[in-house]
Amino acid sequence: MAVHFPFDNSYAALPEGFFARVAPTPVATPRLIKLNRPLARELGLDPDRLDSPEGAEILAGKRIPEGADPIAMAYAGHQFGNFVPQLGDGRAILLGEVIDQNGVRRDIQLKGSGPTPYSRRGDGRAALGPVLREYIVSEAMAALDIPTTRSLAAVITGETVARETLLPGAVLTRIATSHIRVGTFQFFAARRNQDAVKALADHVIARHYPNAINTKQPYLTLLQEVIRRQAELVARWLLVGFIHGVMNTDNCSVAGETIDYGPCAFMDGYDPTKVFSSIDHTGRYAYGNQPRIALWNLTRLAECLVPLISDDQDAAIADAEAALGQFSEQFGQAYHAGLRAKLGLFTAQDGDRELIGDLLGAMIEQAADFTLTFRGLSDLAGNAETDSVRNLFAEPAAFDGWLGRWRQRTAAEPQDAATRRAAMQAVNPAFIPRNHRIQAVIEAAVERDDFAPFEELLAVLAHPYRDQPGFAGYAQPPQPHEQVLQTFCGT
């Protein structure tokens, strides 16, 4: 039987200016290298039928399934602060939408499926390395319980793509609750097309924020909800040491999901100024700058929505500014609550922020590994030996004084050691997708057509909060010769 996709397409029913209808460009000999079978079932798809020659052809864009309405979405965006009035899906094509098993509408998009009217002289293709990177990191983020796009499948095309050298081509099937970005609103606002901005806002409200429909100011409620989700999302990034790397407005999802994993990376040693992206020369998107940039992006969204918020533009601007003014508090609450949880503190007390700040300061000075420090503290909560954490600090004595204060603080709460340790282990991952591990996976796949390291890394990262003694090496930071100093978009 044919592979069946229960498409229910809504974005393609919007006016033509929202997208360009374009079919994927067929590829030579598609080979399915990874299928996310649990996600397929969640989407109402049959993984056994997808895992077939016909399925590989669909997932590579060589065959169009019944009910698909392939489109490339239009959007604009600020890239490193500079406005580009037309970007759009230059190498991605939305096949359509399905309603998943939980009643949620999800996009099915092929990334690397060929040129579109928005390709801007690009070939519309993707190389295998960036496809594997996005698959690994997006699925790791999902396992960390951070809102994110998902990866359904990765397919090798049987063709090469020209980058610095000739590289194997691949297509990623990306799943999102939508691919609507701040830049999508900017596309129409820049053209002073208020009817289109309103149609887009109405679509986003119906799709993502239906509770806004019956409020007195639905477009203000929309802005407030996007701000809240972004504040909470960026807080969660910081709590696991994640650096997005390219927080342009066209990479900012109004659904509050992490999207576009090009030059992303996770920190090893804690450093708020850390930058990995090869194109971020000024540190605009450094780890510690991410909350500020999120607010900057949200301000650009507010500018698009102000004409809809109220006929009285002075009142609309005041309302939008008040909504934006909530971001810092919302981010701060989510971030500090998360840090208290990482330290096993069940209540908020005076002095907690100083305690947290002193630990982070010592971690900066001593180049302590972010992930291992907090995971190690989880073990110390269960009365483990202190050396596993002390040895992460260049001068262990810098940690000892702080440890005494932390033990005194936790002793003021009634929870026993086992309860505290379990709570801390549930929020402090042992395993993150470390850059050197991703690089090793990519090299094995690209240079040797060996996907065993890819499969093993995915299996480990699927359970980030679980001790996995047989894979303890995956928790370790890189040796000096393994360090990855820069990451690349791969476009």
Swiss-Prot record:
Organism: Rhodopseudomonas palustris (strain BisB18)
Annotated signal sequence range: none
Record-given protein name: Protein nucleotidyltransferase YdiU
UniProt keyword annotations, A-Z: ATP-binding, Magnesium, Manganese, Metal-binding, Nucleotide-binding, Nucleotidyltransferase, Transferase
UniProt xrefs under Pfam families: SelO
Active site: D250
Keyword set includes Metal-binding: yes
Family: Belongs to the SELO family.
Main function: Nucleotidyltransferase involved in the post-translational modification of proteins. It can catalyze the addition of adenosine monophosphate (AMP) or uridine monophosphate (UMP) to a protein, resulting in modifications known as AMPylation and UMPylation.
